[in-house]
Amino acid sequence: MSVLLLEAFYGGSHKQLLDLLKESVEDCVSFTLPAKKWHWRARTSALYFMQAVPANSSYRVLFTSSVLNLAELVALRPDLGHLKKVLYFHENQLVYPVRKSQERDFQYGYNQILSCLVADVVVFNSSFNMESFLSSISTFMKTMPDHRPKDLERLIRPKCHVLHFPIRFPDVTRFLPAHKRLRHPVRCDDIHAPAAKSHIQTSSPSSYPDVEPPEKMLNVAGTNQSHEPTSVTPHQETASPLCGHEGEKLRPLHIVWPHRWEHDKDPQLFFQTLLKLKDRQLSFEVSVLGETFTDVPDIFSEAKEQLVDHIQHWGFMPSKEDYLKVLCQADVVVSTAKHEFFGVAMLEAVHCGCYPLCPKALVYPEIFPATYLYSTPEQLCKRLQEFCKRPQLARQHVVQVSLSSFSWDSLGDNFRSLLKADSGRMFTDKHMA
């Protein structure tokens, strides 16, 4: 085996990526740890992999996420030091939201900086992730009392690239309600159509347009077609034979929240918003999905009791098919995240026909046009209130998000190139933005 895949937190998007690589990259072997006790994985996984990974002279490339302290592993296993070491950042700890600055554990961010210094290639899933990490290094290191190292960003930046997280969008046609099928016919060859634009960027900062041009507009099933948008804002209505039926008008708005049950996803804001809608006697249904871990914020049990009459689905759905069915039945997908560097769940929901509402912050402006972003909790509440009163506005809207830009079929070759040991440069010029 020439490619060694290591994942210290084998769950969620970390698991999705590793599974794709295992399926698609020849001559690879993987070693993982379960997605439990994240903090302990970050602290101790290097020691585990030191013992778990057998010596093998055929290894040429080592790929791992930034949960693992790569510097520790290389020190513990000098035989791995000569490999091409690729470090992938799903998230970074330098800007992880904490309630008070004193609560930030210096060690996690410090580990990631050390890992970057020993890696040969450092890859981020978004420009926001990369720039927020690199621009925070200097400030982060100033928390040291003295003898602070200098110029770490200058040493790390030349290694850095952006390679968006790849999603394998399944054909969900059979799960779509009639009004979604009529508006958005799905063909498998459309779902897997190559993206028209490059997906690799160097570490130079870049700007992103607020709205994709019409020729980039994709329908929610991923079909890349050149046509004028039938809807640009939630205030424009489009004629639709089925959506005009009384049944569609009377069915309550279905809101889905498909995120980890942790404080950094700000469930407090989401449930506070729903309770305001309830107090205003607005009609809606809600599905709260996403993974749960050891410590679940109290707001979930409190909200479940208060919103019991509105709940469609509650809790993690182990079956991916069942999860997709719920997304296909929903109308609006909401993010209230305070910590997000890509957002697989939001894009999967868009693929299933949901209208996205995201904060105008973090990675979201990089992926979603301005019409899907809100700046304040009041704006989020106002948008949902409008959709509750007129759910057909969300149901008739054609979402303008370039899903093919994030598909495995578009990005797979770039990952395969990344994992080639003999590539003098990581990518050819045609892959560089």
From Swiss-Prot:
Start-end of Polar residues biased regions: 221-239
Entry's EC annotation: 2.4.1.110
Keyword annotations of the record: Cytoplasm, Glycosyltransferase, Nucleus, Transferase
Source species, domain of life: Eukaryota
GO CC annotations, alphabetized: cytoplasm; nucleus
Changes seen on gene knockout: Decreased postembryonic growth, characterized by shortened body length.
Entries under Gene3D superfamilies matching the protein: Glycogen Phosphorylase B (3.40.50.2000)
GO biological process terms held by the UniProt record: central nervous system development; regulation of translation; tRNA modification
Catalytic activity: queuosine(34) in tRNA(Asp) + GDP-alpha-D-mannose = O-4''-alpha-D-mannosylqueuosine(34) in tRNA(Asp) + GDP + H(+)
GO MF term list: tRNA-queuosine(34) beta-mannosyltransferase activity
Coiled coil location: none
Protein name as annotated: tRNA-queuosine alpha-mannosyltransferase
